[in-house]
C-alpha cells in the first residue's frame, strides 16, 4: 500500500477511535505504524506475549531481548544515529510443538539454563510495563 494512502487510512482510524471510543487490535510487524497509532503494545513471539507496555514506555525502555532486537531493526535515515544493531541468530523453535522454556531461548544472546527449562510469565516492572524474561526475575 502506498505510504500516503496508508497514512490517510491510519488517520481516519484514529479519528473514528476518538469520535466513537473504539478500540483496535493491530497485528503487524510495521513498528512505525504501531508507534503512531497505539497507546499500549504487546509484543508476541511464537504465540506468547513477551512484553507489554504503554507505547512510549516500550519504545523508550524495551526490556525483552526480542523487543530490543525488533526496535533495533527499525531503519533510521542516517547510520550515524544508530546506536546499536541486534541481529537475531539461531534456529526458530518449532511453533507447533515448542520445547519447554522460553520460546525465544534458542535465538537469545542472554539465554540461561533457566530460560531453557521453564516458561516465563509476565512480570510487573511498574508503570504498566510487563516482561516475560528471566533477566528480570528477583
Task: Give, region by region, the residue ranges found by the protein language model.
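Charged, flexible cofactor/metal-binding loops and thiol motifs
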Residues: 55-138
Amino acid at each position: 500500500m502506498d505510504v500516503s494512502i496508508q497514512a490517510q487510512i491510519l488517520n481516519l482510524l484514529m479519528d473514528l477511535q476518538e469520535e466513537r471510543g473504539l478500540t483496535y487490535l493491530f497485528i503487524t510487524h510495521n513498528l512505525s505504524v504501531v508507534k503512531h497509532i497505539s497507546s499500549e503494545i504487546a509484543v508476541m513471539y511464537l504465540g506468547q506475549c513477551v512484553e507489554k507496555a504503554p507505547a512510549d514506555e516500550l519504545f523508550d525502555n524495551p526490556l525483552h531481548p526480542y523487543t530490543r532486537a525488533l526496535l533495533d531493526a527499525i531503519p533510521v535515515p542516517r547510520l550515524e544515529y544508530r546506536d546499536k544493531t541486534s541481529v537475531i541468530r539461531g534456529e526458530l523453535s518449532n511453533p507447533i510443538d515448542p520445547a519447554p522454556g522460553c520460546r525465544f531461548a534458542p535465538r537469545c544472546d542472554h539465554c540461561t539454563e533457566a530460560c531453557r527449562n521453564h516458561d516465563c510469565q509476565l512480570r510487573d516492572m511498574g508503570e504498566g510495563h510487563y516482561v516475560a524474561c528471566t533477566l528480570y526475575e528477583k
